[in-house]
């Protein structure tokens, strides 16, 4: 009875190792795309909530959330206690079901950002696979979030 030679076993192990590395690379890419899809979905949901808020109150600056009626900027879900964060206030008022959290957020100052005025808003995120060019997010005159805070994607209204 003859078994496998050492060379044959090494070839089989090398092939299995090569195939497993391809599978793991594909899984990592899928996870990255899923996290970016969640970020885009979160921004759209907050944008809709802000539009509904503006429709009722005439401003995109959420009262009781720290920006004041003249506008402001900050972290969307920073856990302020008084005043509360913008996202938490939108939840409190019934415009959002839950506070959106970036999938890889490690602290309240590493997630989504918001800038608002009475007439418009911009929401910022950091995508792992951003588009080749950042969308035009200078609607509110804020142009440094991409460099100052590492944000590479935004939506504006």
Features from the language model and the residues they span:
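Membrane-proximal N-terminal amphipathic helix
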Residues: 32-59, 86
């Amino acid at each position: 009875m003859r078994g496998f030679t050492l060379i044959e076993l090494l070839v089989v192990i090398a092939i299995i190792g090569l195939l497993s590395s391809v599978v793991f690379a594909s899984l990592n890419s899928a996870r990255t795309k899923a996290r970016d899809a969640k970020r885009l979905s979160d921004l759209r949901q907050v944008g809709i909530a802000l539009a509904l808020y503006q429709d009722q109150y005439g401003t995109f600056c959420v009262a009781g959330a720290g920006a004041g009626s003249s506008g402001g900027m900050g972290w969307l879900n920073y856990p302020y206690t008084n005043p509360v964060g913008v996202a938490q206030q939108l939840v409190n008022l019934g415009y959002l079901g839950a506070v959106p959290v970036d999938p890889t957020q490690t602290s309240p100052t590493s997630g989504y950002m918001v800038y608002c005025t009475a007439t418009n808003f911009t929401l910022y995120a950091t995508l792992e696979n951003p588009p080749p060019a950042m969308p035009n997010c200078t609607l509110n005159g804020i142009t440094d979030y991409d460099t100052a805070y590492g944000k590479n994607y935004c939506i504006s209204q």
